């Protein structure tokens, strides 16, 4: 006859859900023994333990409408779908179905509450929303001078001049824009730099030369010239040893 074919295995179990305003999470580990000799698998043994956690909190609640629903600049721009804008704006402005726009968060007017800045595709203005005391927001994109119409993917708030407020570095289609904050959320252009090699997508900051001010590093994506330039992906699309991306850029801050 055939040899006995028994197999031991371990199963990790994790269930989570909400019912009657209570969040329940069940975690456990099961030890199983199966008989594989017959035509159908037979479970010979199961043992293990479970842990159940109950909580009245534990999930995020969508408050987009309650915090931004009364802001006309928000509803008119963000409540419309992608098809609405791609069907009305020229691709030459920089709009694309690919997206990849990010959100930057910082206290830009020094009132102790975080505000948010939303990058937008070309042809649509970036939006700066100031958080008020009741949890709602007001649009200050135009008043702050940050309503760029250039295609934008990434932004970073960082104190570049060590004056105690959050300045803005914005990565737009052609390069970067550096904006000085007056401490009350009003921005003035300090500098702009073209990035000829590639389009900027994200920005990070650190004092890499340990001179007391923050430098910044710009991560880029598609190369600009030649056949590799494309709105969505570089060509070809390698799955390993990728070397067809755009060149990143490191900027040293000399305090001026």
Regions found by a protein language model. Name each.
Residues 1-256:
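Beta-propeller-forming repeat regions
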